[in-house]
Amino acid sequence: MSLTIPSPASGTSTSATTDTAPAAAPQRTYQVRTFGCQMNVHDSERMAGMLEDAGYVPASGENADVVVFNTCAVRENADNKLYGNLGMLAPVKAANPGMQIAVGGCLAQKDRETILKKAPWVDAVFGTHNVGALPALLDRARHNNEAQLEILESLDVFPSTLPTKRDSVYSGWVSISVGCNNTCTFCIVPALRGKEKDRRPGDILAEIQALVDDGAIEVTLLGQNVNSYGVEFGDRQAFSKLLRACGEIQGLERVRFTSPHPAAFTDDVIDAMAETPNVMPQLHMPLQSGSDKVLKDMKRSYRSTKFLGILDKVRERIPHAAISTDIIVGFPGETEEDFQATLDVVEKSRFATAFTFQYSKRPGTPAADLPDQLPKAVVQERFERLTALQDRIAAEENARQLGRRVEVMVTAQSGRKSEETHRLSGRSQDQRLVHFSVPEGAEKPRPGDLVTVTITEAAAFHLVADPASAADYSLRRSRAGDAWDRSQADSCGAPVAGGGAGSNGGKGGVSLGMPALPVRRS
């Protein structure tokens, strides 16, 4: 679907012809604002890559010539967040003739014309299947002085073939599939991203190799349901084979993936995780509910016994695995007995982290039409009980890490109190967030380097390592750290000593894997 809709006129100016050649027009700047999941974060990298390929440059501050919103449609507050942001930009655009606003992603795929009706100052709306159209839509909107709406109903080109500006030089997202064949009643994503489409293994491995050649030492394999990878070309063990193939890539030190589905999580994947050294001892396994009745209503096609059995198998093969999950509270028809079943499964599962959500009614999903929608007060009370339980479990599980020696990959992001504590931050192999200090006289690591430290403090959402002396601190400078040095030198226009593989400019803006804190929704 492609529509052209009149938009507010952008100011233009003309100047008298002179004998001197006009100065070159300054490059237009851009900013991409991302809402939602890791898939959206990676899509935003593609949007940035395409804009830079078209001659745009990143905005140095808040003011940009082009602002792109990459949206989420999973929860109601995603709508509110988008339209709130668009409302705040309306006067900014009115005061800056030539500024453009574009909206893409899942909410754009869903709302389509509604976005232009609610925010007629938007210049371009595009969906999940035509991310590559963004630069052309912006150009067309400027040329025609009309808003452009283009939504495709199926994938135009697999997005990983598009230019990409990586947010991190030491870690990278790699899509192995897009879309989903499941029919969970609460989820609108399959309707917006379509049926599952798989990349060929050779294409995936080539992209990973290119990332490693540029200095990355960590990748996260992305898909709506990664362990169903291979369904398009008829190989039920394709995902486990892909994990093992990642283990053959020299220089690739950490492999993660998100997210799998319990119904199709098979023993060959667990074996590949356990037997491939660079596949990290970390698993995100969405539970959603511990009640078999609610799981049936959700059309999740597994039950609590199967879920707990998967965790048992993983921990048997990978004893130190950290397991995280997603849980929805207040699904229509959830009784107190159903909720207690969820609490029981959470207690048994001993999750390192749980991302807990209050059910949000989404038009267009089967669950939105179910009877027995729960009162807000009931959902809130259950949510608070669940988060209190999980916070206790997380603190207990982290306390078990005290005294352990862990290898931490240093990230560009620091903790909120880093200026006070002078600690740096990073992720352990099992994806726990670790804040650590560098002993006096020891060499300071760069983002992408690896340090080995002993855990000295534990809290529910992070660990602390304060080495008593330099003898309790080990630094391994990495190719990823070299890549970070080069990227910083490139951004400053300064030379840097060589080391490691070829350069891939960028900044360390995105931490891979799951967020550090559970998502709190009120």
Swiss-Prot record:
EC numbers on record: 2.8.4.3
One Gene Ontology cellular component annotation held by this UniProt entry: cytosol
Domain annotation MTTase N-terminal: ranges: 28-143
Low complexity bias spans: 1-26
Binding site for [4Fe-4S] cluster 1: 37, 72, 106
Disulfide topology: none
Cofactor(s) this protein cannot do without: [4Fe-4S] cluster
Role noted for this protein: Catalyzes the methylthiolation of N6-(dimethylallyl)adenosine (i(6)A), leading to the formation of 2-methylthio-N6-(dimethylallyl)adenosine (ms(2)i(6)A) at position 37 in tRNAs that read codons beginning with uridine.
Family under the similarity heading: Belongs to the methylthiotransferase family. MiaB subfamily.
Protein name: tRNA-2-methylthio-N(6)-dimethylallyladenosine synthase
Source organism (scientific name): Arthrobacter sp. (strain FB24)
The gene coding this protein: miaB
